[in-house]
């Protein structure tokens, strides 16, 4: 008797049943832990304590502040902008934070896909190239303001993750 695909499936069944999907609660906990880690890294950079995240600095309006509604797509967009800014600073202080933001964005995509709302990969600022002069003229100020605002945004994201944000 020929069993073909059925026999192969039954032979693979023990292996297939062993594979488990990552529980969404674990992904959410990992996301929160990574946010706390990034906030701690920002706190460890001593010069970021001098500026309030709400302070307005002329020429640095492209750095996002807090948003009233933070959906998963808005969180990803905000993190993409911060990642683009930090990468352009070429500072030793922010290399690991930039890498952590990439990992955080991946976790947000996992959370979104678990809610059946896959996020398109968000891009950073489209007019970012025109800001090169601002960045070169004020690297230190840009770093301080960006890290301060990023820290506030991450703390807000941490609070909102408990409320199970929408797509």
UniProtKB/Swiss-Prot annotation:
GO terms for biological process: activation of protein kinase C activity; bone growth; cellular response to leptin stimulus; energy reserve metabolic process; intestinal absorption; leptin-mediated signaling pathway; lipid metabolic process; negative regulation of appetite by leptin-mediated signaling pathway. This is Leptin. It comes from the Eukaryota. One of its GO terms (cellular component) is extracellular space. The keyword Signal applies. Keywords: Disulfide bond, Obesity, Secreted, Signal. Belongs to the leptin family.
């Amino acid at each position: 008797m020929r069993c073909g695909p059925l026999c192969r499936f039954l032979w693979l069944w023990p292996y297939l049943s062993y594979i488990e999907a990552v529980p969404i609660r674990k992904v959410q906990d990992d996301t929160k832990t990574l946010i706390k880690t990034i906030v701690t890294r920002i706190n460890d950079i001593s010069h970021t304590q001098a500026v309030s995240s709400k302070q307005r600095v002329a020429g640095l309006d492209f750095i996002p502040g807090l948003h009233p509604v933070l959906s998963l797509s808005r969180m990803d967009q905000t993190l993409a902008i911060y990642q683009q800014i930090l990468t352009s600073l070429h500072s030793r202080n922010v290399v690991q934070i930039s890498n952590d933001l990439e990992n955080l964005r991946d976790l947000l995509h996992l959370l979104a896909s678990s809610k059946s709302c896959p996020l398109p990969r968000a891009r950073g600022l489209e007019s970012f190239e025109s800001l090169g002069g601002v960045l070169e003229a004020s690297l230190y100020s840009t770093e301080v303001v960006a890290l301060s605002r990023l820290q506030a945004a991450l703390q807000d994201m941490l609070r909102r993750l408990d409320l199970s944000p929408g797509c």
